[in-house]
Amino acid sequence: MFSASTTPEQPLGLSGDATPPLPTSVPLDWAAFRRAFLIDDAWRPLLEPELANPLTARLLAEYDRRCQTEEVLPPREDVFSWTRYCTPDDVRVVIIGQDPYHHPGQAHGLAFSVRADVPVPPSLRNVLAAVKNCYPDARMSGRGCLEKWARDGVLLLNTTLTVKRGAAASHSKLGWDRFVGGVVQRLAARRPGLVFMLWGAHAQNAIRPDPRQHYVLKFSHPSPLSKVPFGTCQHFLAANRYLETRDIMPIDWSV
């Protein structure tokens, strides 16, 4: 597949429990890994195979070391929050980002999304403008929290899941990209007919779904620095038209 709804079960330890330790032995133990990051168990078939790879143990060891020496974003309980909004079998659209926002209070585990109480970043503002261009009647709250999309089956996934506060791309060499690539590859094999939105060269090089099996949409990155204005992107409309041809419920892109 690659060259590179039901309500999910409530994850363990979400109500103020002491932070569980990271697993260290190889192969990594699924139960310990799940507890450490509050991962929904529905994602086990897609994530657990990565735990047998020694590179994942090395990744977690380096992540743990960074947590001891620098402020890492998002908080550990949000690194895998994308597993808690919908199950793999409910995913309809995959939007690939690069790494989390690096200012405090913004990142919460969903690519491009920010917490509801913080200003909308410029790239996300352009994404929402493109939605409005596709759907002029869409209700937009003025906030940048995309949890509603995630619950509707939009997987908002960064290729790098963590970042040092104030230092963009600072964790890009930890190995998250390999881990995430494996997860997406298994999702694509399990779920033919997904819509992939790949914005910018990074996403398009990192994730390469088979266009014979999936609907692959490419555009420039929504950054204000991109040469092509993202407001002209028609991906949200195109995705829904494709889903409708497969008798799948379209996404309500309102925020």
Curated annotation (Swiss-Prot):
Alphabetized UniProt keyword annotations: DNA damage, DNA repair, Host nucleus, Hydrolase
UniProt cross-references to CDD domains, sorted A to Z: UDG-F1-like (cd10027)
Catalysed transformations (reactions): Hydrolyzes single-stranded DNA or mismatched double-stranded DNA and polynucleotides, releasing free uracil
Keyword Cell inner membrane attached: no
Location relative to the cell: Host nucleus
GO biological process, alphabetically ordered: base-excision repair, AP site formation via deaminated base removal
Active site (catalytic residues): 99
Molecular function as annotated in GO: uracil DNA N-glycosylase activity
Taxonomy, superkingdom: Viruses
Main function: Excises uracil residues from the DNA which can arise as a result of misincorporation of dUMP residues by DNA polymerase or deamination of cytosines. Therefore may reduce deleterious uracil incorporation into the viral genome, particularly in terminally differentiated cells which lack DNA repair enzymes.
Protein name stated in the entry: Uracil-DNA glycosylase
